[in-house]
From Swiss-Prot:
<feature type="modified residue" description="Phosphoserine">
    <location>
        <position position="961"/>
    </location>
</feature>
<feature type="compositionally biased region" description="Polar residues">
    <location>
        <begin position="1299"/>
        <end position="1308"/>
    </location>
</feature>
<feature type="modified residue" description="Phosphoserine">
    <location>
        <position position="690"/>
    </location>
</feature>
<comment type="function">
    <text>Functions as a GTPase-activating protein (GAP) for RAC1 and CDC42. Required for cell spreading, polarized lamellipodia formation and cell migration.</text>
</comment>
<feature type="modified residue" description="Phosphothreonine">
    <location>
        <position position="769"/>
    </location>
</feature>
<feature type="region of interest" description="Disordered">
    <location>
        <begin position="258"/>
        <end position="277"/>
    </location>
</feature>
<protein>
    <recommendedName>
        <fullName>Rho GTPase-activating protein 31</fullName>
    </recommendedName>
</protein>
<feature type="modified residue" description="Phosphothreonine">
    <location>
        <position position="283"/>
    </location>
</feature>
<feature type="modified residue" description="Phosphoserine">
    <location>
        <position position="765"/>
    </location>
</feature>
<keyword id="KW-0343">GTPase activation</keyword>
<feature type="modified residue" description="Phosphothreonine; by GSK3">
    <location>
        <position position="776"/>
    </location>
</feature>
<feature type="compositionally biased region" description="Basic and acidic residues">
    <location>
        <begin position="543"/>
        <end position="556"/>
    </location>
</feature>
<feature type="region of interest" description="Disordered">
    <location>
        <begin position="652"/>
        <end position="700"/>
    </location>
</feature>
<feature type="modified residue" description="Phosphothreonine">
    <location>
        <position position="666"/>
    </location>
</feature>
<feature type="region of interest" description="Disordered">
    <location>
        <begin position="1031"/>
        <end position="1095"/>
    </location>
</feature>
<feature type="region of interest" description="Disordered">
    <location>
        <begin position="511"/>
        <end position="621"/>
    </location>
</feature>
<feature type="modified residue" description="Phosphoserine">
    <location>
        <position position="1092"/>
    </location>
</feature>
């Protein structure tokens, strides 16, 4: 079976072999009703083959070949021989091989389209009738054989409790052998097409299996009676396939088929390459379906062979496949329900793992099971929605609650092979049920029956989720476990594989799921109507709910109780991010602007929902459009972005409109769910697709308003367009030009929202105002914005999204990049959530902050993509629950952000931003203007404190904080004068405060955020458009209401309006410093942004984030925010800086990130971060020399200073920390002292501690990284830059580490750090970034600057809260509890002993996400995973 060539040769050699002979000819010549091979194999298997994984597992190749020869030589092999009894799977493999080698498949080529169409018919009854009619068209021999085979398989499925092979799994393994498309075989090399085809084929076969009695009872006689007439049909269906009626040798038959004009044989031959290498689906006896689906395009066949061949033992298969399979098994183990992990795992271990980790989300795994070529359906906006539902339905079959996954839709829509494969649609049970009704697609017919049958009727024996999951696993192509390299390539897919977040959704937010489902795609029925039907009418409703909810949510958010609601949004966003993975990052950027617009519109004409779908569109667009034109992207955006955005919609719409507080709470689960299921996101996206169009319609009304504002903004922004482009480039290194449009849209949208939301920021200024609601509004807003833009605007938005995504996807598509992007996206997701939350408050109040947040989201998204990838992994591992919190991180500010130490992801954005900065101060100013809008982005970014963090995030995304702030400033002028002034004032004050308290304030913000005013950060973010300012203000708002004073958070309008120029002038000074530093860092940052380390950290943080569950797991900045609002912002800056470098090094970094993301389980990335951390710690310690960057800069980048090798790192971090305390006397000091110890560790006390220490260090690392690098470059351009890069990397890593501890800080870290001391911190920090396995692999890659950077980055990730010493990131981990500046050396030492500690940390770090979820389980939680 594996050796197809040999088999084919045997086939040709076997003179009178039934193999490779046309079925009709063979049966006519042999006088048999059904092929003897099938009959004998089926009888044998029914007697002896009721074993685990029958038909899924592959037999021994030699035995298969021997059997084939015996059957071919007219012998009647004795299957009861010991050799075959010992290798029962060889008989099943032979049976599949026979059908795979048929010149014309059992379900003929001619009827392929009819089958797929019949199955896509919506009503099940209609499907049944259609399928029955199509089956009756089969030639009589094919009909009889099909009936025999289907009855046999249905009988085998009845033993699914023993075999773990229910109808879905059997359909998955058999579909490629029975149903093939010439077109697909012609393009057999196309993994995407093959995967999609397998999904469709699986749906068809599953449907037939589930309805075998109805189809063949009534139809069989007719079919048989029609034998004569059918003979005629046969010639039609089987073009002269049966030339000679006599039985000819295989060689002869094949030669004839090739030589003759038999299209089937001929085409099959050509398409599948030589018959020796039959179509990929048929390449492997057992594994063809699953393996094909699971493995990536390039590695598909090999992976398939490995997967199938792994042996009859599913566990061994898991082992063989490596990280993925092992994970799958682990998941299956984790999911008690899916005891059949063996068979399932081998088929889709990765998805299983993530889902199983989720535990309750195992259903999600099932739901994500198949990728139907939703692309078709997606092409039509409405269709895409339907597709999504179906997809969700499909995926949901296995899990009722995992319906939220809209991510798969994205994958389906988009042909991205890896992403598609990885994307797994997850629908909740309701969605599942409603999917068939709501969405007529391939999935629908198969899904509905599959779901029903599989979950309930068909296999009542295995009603438990285990069977469902099992089925899911098998049917999920992305579930395939692949080597690290493959996973790197598939990292994007891998991220989608992180269905766990979606599963988390399904598990945690079942109730909310229904609401989110509609947006998700695989949402419950009520949800679906929400997504599709509700869009026109619901849009307003949702907008209204959004507007109203913001206030209720805000309080919740302040209290962390909002955390669940926010989490849902965040998780949804996460899903979206995952779905988009890389693409969503860019799209998110575009979405954010659109979201801003939506915000605006929401304010004017509540249309958050429309915005969401479009947001989805945008998100999905990026992957679709990797580097395509805007228009193309737009077209694709409709499909793919919608998928992605649908996920977002899930969070926003569901949260707000359907599930005000409860929904939001539920949202977290969906939110986290997406990470692993970016694939699940696809389903959500699908509905989004249709929703966006609907949105356009409803947006039409608001369109005029928004368009007017946007047009004005656009006009203003047009000049900024180039700058935006630069920023975009930095953000998404791939396509600056494409990004520019996105940025433009963003800013345009931002500006109008800014104007509208001017009043809002004030109102939102209260920390809790924005909290929960904003995520929804923001998420919805993007779509609304899109719709409001109208077709033109939408197109532009889409184009920009597409461009951005195109840019980002390029790196993401790169084997490595997809994961980093995903992670960044994940990071962005939390930030987006924040933005959304802020947007909601802004919806309540002004629309300006919302835009800012949206913009912020873009950079974060970039960071979030990699993070998202990582997140999925976490989600997969029982982090889904936490993930929602983290997704709703914005909601649970502290947790979410610290948790998601996706700073590496963010770092890339920051780096890109820095790069943009390098492009020009003017560009920076413009960027800053954009940044103001990006302030929304900020919110979106992981910085839970939306304002401050957003500011930084924006900075990061746009060249540099300087540039960002300046851009914001410049942009503000574009904004209405009032808005501008408000922004300027806010930014100025915030910037100052932020710079001054960047380390401390972040810390204080975090504590405030985390404890007293968890929501405050959001309001702050909402209030500001400026990144730094917002960030700073948020801390001020939260901790000392400084923001209100500075930027009149209550009256941001007046503040910003009053001092737009003042801010410009002030910020320029501050920003220039920052700008320089960031620019400087930009160069080093690229080295720094080593995704590998970051990713590893991110990957670990994913778990941590999930662990935080309350906190923001999305991005390390977000996590930092959790720990310290401002610190996270700093993280974002650093992260973004790295993110830009990431993008520059996207392939490399993304590769690493991909490894990390796909292989958080792979551990290699983690270890890399750990090793790098130690290495960087050593280097940084040696290099650490006190260099004092501008105070402002220092405030913003306290930690990076230590990180800097130039020595400014060590001294400056102290200075910065001190400065920060000075600036923020109360909180900053507290932050500096306490942040590192227990920023996240203790809710309020420890959090302040850690926030101060960790935040200060983080911020210092981040700021030092970004700003300080500039400084560093000045004194020691090359050494400094190198050191800076490394430091920045270390900072990033610290952030990641911090993110890791962030999760701990929130829960375990609180306890551990409070009492654990440096060791606990070390475990926490190094642990997350470093996995035991990962550590050894990548740990010792410090030789290259990139590696060093990675190490540095890993180090920050490791000690996210204690980013005090960038250079001592590891040391910071060790020291994590105290002294940001001094701790550098100590921390370095602690980190240096990575070997012993690594093991410790690796388990704890690996299981950190759980730690986030469970305080006590912080260290062990990850291990549990």
């Amino acid at each position: 079976m594996k050796n197809k060539g040999a088999k084919q040769k045997l086939k040709r050699k076997g003179a009178a072999s039934a193999f490779g002979c046309d079925l009709t000819e063979y049966l006519e010549s042999s006088g048999q009703d059904v092929p003897y091979v099938l009959k004998s194999c089926a009888e044998f298997i029914e007697t002896h083959g009721i074993v685990d994984g029958i038909y899924r597992l592959s037999g021994i190749t030699s035995n298969i070949q021997r059997l084939r020869q015996e059957f071919g030589s007219d012998q009647c092999p004795d299957l009861t021989r010991e050799v075959y009894l010992q290798d029962i799977h060889c008989v099943g493999s032979l049976c599949k091989l026979y059908f795979r080698e048929l010149p014309n498949p059992l379900l003929t080529y001619e009827l392929y389209e009819k089958f797929t169409e019949a199955v896509s018919h919506r009503p099940e009854e209609g499907q049944l009738a259609r399928i029955q009619n199509v089956i009756l068209e089969l030639p009589p021999p094919h009909y009889r054989t099909l009936e025999y085979l289907i009855r046999h398989l249905a009988h085998i499925a009845s033993f699914s409790s023993k075999t773990n092979m229910h109808a879905r799994n059997l359909a998955l393994v058999w579909a490629p052998n029975l149903l093939r498309s010439k077109k697909i075989e012609a393009t057999i090399c196309n993994g995407d097409a093959a995967f999609l085809a397998v999904r469709v084929q699986q749906v068809v076969i599953e449907f037939i299996l589930n309805h075998a009695d109805q189809i063949f009872n009534g139809g069989a006689p007719g079919a048989l009676q029609q034998d004569e007439s059918r003979t005629i049909t046969k010639s039609l269906t089987l073009p002269a396939l049966s030339l000679p009626m006599k039985l000819v040798s295989l060689e002869e038959a094949q030669a004839r088929s090739l030589a003759t004009n038999h299209p089937a044989r001929k085409e099959r031959r050509e398409n599948s390459l030589p018959e020796i290498v039959p179509p990929p689906f048929h390449t492997v006896l057992e594994l063809p379906d699953n393996k094909r689906k699971l493995s990536s395009k390039s590695k598909k066949w090999k992976s398939i062979f490995n997967l199938g061949r792994s042996g009859s033992d599913s566990k061994s298969k898991l082992s063989r496949n490596g990280s993925v399979f092992v994970r799958g098994q682990r998941l299956s183990v984790e999911k008690a329900t899916i005891r059949p992990a063996k068979s399932m795992d081998s088929l889709c271990s990765v998805p299983v793992e993530g889902k199983e980790n989720k535990g309750n989300f195992s259903r999600t795994v099932t739901t994500g099971g198949f990728f139907i070529p939703a692309t078709k359906m997606h092409a039509s906006s409405t269709g895409s929605s339907c597709d999504l539902s179906k997809e969700g339905e499909w995926g949901q079959e296995g899990m009722p609650a995992g319906a939220e996954g809209g991510c798969e839709v994205g994958g389906q829509i988009r042909p991205l092979p890896e992403q598609l494969k990885v994307f797994r649609p997850i629908g909740d049970p309701e969605s599942e049920q409603s999917a068939p009704k709501l969405l007529g697609m391939f999935y629908t017919s198969s899904d509905s029956p599959g779901k029903s049958v599989f979950t309930s009727s068909l296999f009542q024996m295995e009603p438990s989720p285990r069977h469902q999951r099992k089925a899911l696993n098998i049917s999920e192509p992305f579930a395939v476990s692949v080597p690290l390299r493959v996973s790197a390539v598939i990292s994007t897919n891998s991220t989608p594989c992180r269905t766990p977040p979606k599963e988390l959704q399904s598990l945690s937010s079942l109730e909310e799921f229904s609401f989110q489902g509609s947006e998700s795609g695989g949402w419950p029925e009520e949800e679906k109507p929400l997504g599709a039907e509700s869009f026109p009418g619901s849009v307003t409703k949702k907008a209204a709910t959004e507007d109203t909810k913001p206030e209720p949510e805000v309080p919740g958010r302040a209290e962390c109780s909002q955390s669940p609601p926010l989490d849902p949004g965040t998780q949804v966003e996460k899903k979206t991010l995952h779905v988009s993975l890389g693409s969503q990052v860019s799209k998110e950027a575009e979405k954010r602007p659109k979201a801003e617009k939506v915000m605006e519109e929401s304010q004017g004409a509540s249309q958050p929902k429309p915005s969401t779908p479009q947001e989805s569109l945008g998100a999905g667009t990026e992957p679709l459009i990797l580097h395509e034109m805007d228009e193309e992207d737009l077209a694709q955006a409709l499909i793919w972005p919608e998928i992605q955005q649908e996920l977002k919609i899930i969070e926003s719409e569901e949260e707000f409109s359907s599930l005000p507080p409860a929904a939001q709470k539920t949202s977290p689960i969906p939110e986290s769910s997406p990470a692993p299921f970016p694939f699940p996101e696809a389903p959500g996206s699908l509905p989004s697709s249709s929703a966006p169009r609907e949105v356009w319609t409803r947006d039409a009304a608001n369109q005029s308003i928004q368009e007017a504002a946007i047009l004005t903004d656009r006009e203003k922004l047009e000049p900024v367009c180039s700058l935006l482009e630069s920023e975009s480039q930095q953000e998404l290194s791939p396509d600056p030009a494409s990004l520019a449009p996105l940025e433009m849209l963003l800013f345009e949208k931002v500006s109008s929202p800014a104007r509208i939301e001017i009043g809002g920021p004030r109102n939102l200024s209260p920390p809790l105002t924005p909290a929960p609601p904003p995520p929804t509004p923001l998420e919805e807003e993007p779509e609304v914005l899109l719709s409001k833009e109208g077709p033109d605007r939408e197109d532009a938005a889409r184009d920009s999204r597409t461009d951005v995504y195109t840019e980002q996807p390029t790196p993401k598509e790169s084997p490595g990049i997809p994961t980093p992007c995903q992670r960044e996206e994940a990071i962005a997701s939390p930030n987006e959530k924040q933005n959304a939350r802020h947007a909601v408050p802004e919806n309540k109040g002004p629309g300006l902050p919302s835009p800012t947040k949206e913009v912020d989201i873009i950079p974060q998204e970039e960071g979030g993509a990699p993070h998202s990838a990582q997140e999925p992994s976490d989600c997969d591992e029982d982090d889904t629950v936490t993930d929602p919190a983290q997704h709703g991180l914005e909601m649970v500010e502290p947790w979410e952000e610290p948790q998601w130490v996706t700073s590496p992801l963010h770092s890339p954005t920051l780096k890109e931003v820095q790069e943009s900065q390098t492009q020009g101060s003017q560009g920076h100013r413009l960027e800053r203007r954009l940044c103001h809008r990006p302030s929304l982005r900020q919110s979106h970014s992981l910085d839970s404190k939306t304002t401050g963090n957003s500011h930084w995030t924006l900075e990061a995304p746009f060249s540099s904080s300087c540039a960002n702030l300046e851009t914001e400033r410049n942009y503000e002028p574009l904004q209405p004068p009032a808005a501008r002034t408000k922004i300027a004032g806010l930014e100025e004050k915030a910037l100052k405060a932020f710079r001054e308290f960047s380390g401390l304030k972040g810390l204080e913000v975090l504590p405030s955020q985390k404890g007293p005013s968890g929501i405050q950060p959001k309001p702050v973010e909402t209030n500001f458009m400026g990144l730094a300012e917002g960030k700073e203000q948020e801390p001020q708002l939260e901790l000392s209401n400084r923001q209100m004073k500075h930027s009149d958070v209550p009256g941001p309008d007046s503040s910003k309006e009053s001092s737009p120029r003042a801010q410009d002038s002030t910020l320029p000074g501050e920003h220039p410093l920052q700008l320089q530093l960031k620019n400087t860092e930009c160069g080093p940052s690229k080295g720094k942004h080593r995704p590998s380390s970051l990713n590893l950290d991110s990957a670990t943080p994913i778990a941590d984030l999930f662990r935080l569950e309350n906190g923001a797991p999305f991005s390390s900045p977000g996590i930092e925010l959790s720990e310290l609002g401002d610190t996270k912002v700093t993280w974002m800056s650093s992260s973004h800086c790295k993110a830009a470098p990431w993008n520059s090094q996207d392939t490399q970094d993304l590769d690493i990130v991909a490894h990390t993301l796909t292989g958080r389980r792979n551990s290699a990335p983690v270890s890399v971060s750990a090793v790098r951390t130690s290495f960087m710690v050593k280097m940084c310690q040696a290099k650490a020399v006190p260099v004092i960057p501008p105070k402002i800069q220092y405030t913003q980048i306290p930690q990076p200073l230590p990180s800097q090798s130039t020595g400014e790192g060590g001294a400056q971090p102290l200075e910065r920390s001190q400065e920060e305390p000075g600036s923020t006397p109360e909180i900053p000091q507290k932050s500096t002292k306490d942040d590192s110890p227990s920023s996240l560790g203790s809710p309020e006390e420890e959090q302040p501690k850690q926030e101060t220490g960790a935040s200060a260090s983080r911020r210092q690392a981040s700021i030092t990284s970004c700003m300080y690098e500039g400084s560093s470059c000045s004194p020691e351009p090359s050494a400094s830059t190198l050191a800076s890069t490394q430091d920045a990397v270390v900072q990033c890593r610290k952030r990641t580490s911090e993110t890791e501890p962030s999760g701990d800080n929130l829960l375990s870290s609180k306890l551990e750090r409070a009492s654990g001391g440096p060791k606990a911190f070390h475990r926490s920090r190094p642990g997350r970034p470093q996995s035991l396995i990962l550590f050894p692999i990548m740990d010792h890659l410090p030789s290259s600057p990139t590696v060093i950077d990675s190490k540095v980055l890993l180090s920050p990730i490791r000690s996210p809260t204690q980013t005090v010493s960038p250079g001592l990131l590891c040391g910071e981990l060790a020291e994590n509890t105290w002294i940001t500046p001094e701790g550098v050396t100590l921390r370095n030492k602690m980190t240096i002993p990575k070997n012993g500690q690594r093991l410790e940390t690796s388990t704890s770090c690996f299981y950190q996400p759980q730690r986030r979820s469970v305080i006590l389980d912080g260290r062990s939680g990850r291990q549990i995973e």
